[in-house]
């Protein structure tokens, strides 16, 4: 099946973003916020990579953090902007590196239901290690790759509860715990918490889709993602 970009490029899909999260009982945003809450403080800055409509970062805003966000879709950024909580938003494709932020830009980084769009996460993890301050938290989700599962599969971009159609299908990727742990270690992060949860049911296989949430702390390690760029 031919697949498309994971970036939302039409106003209808963007307008349905929040509705689909409710329809599919998606609580990944709440999971990540709950796991990260003890490590953040009011007044801290948080950068949401793939902020979308702001479902995840608005929770951090309500806890007193200053939110910055990046997304490749103008349509969902417009929706996020209309909610009026973000201190700064940028349109940028996460595949285009380096990211448009200086080194040690923010206290914390989050990325929820985004990293499963990437087959190779290594370059992005290097960038995240560069822009986060030492002691900061990187909280994110990936889809857990279980034994016997293929790494990649097709799914609808927004209507995930329906079988994939060629005009709306995108490729998503699963990642094992060992792979994520290795990337975190290589980039100077200490793993603090993990939690597996059911994200939604994938209709093409009639199986539950399991995501795993991670919370890791950036350590002050020489040569671990601290190269000055941008």
Go through each PLM region and give its residues:
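Short alpha-helix
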Residues: 171-188
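Class I SAM-dependent methyltransferase SAM/SAH-binding core
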Residues: 53-97
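Conserved class I S-adenosyl-L-methionine
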Residues: 1-41, 43-52, 59, 137-167, 171
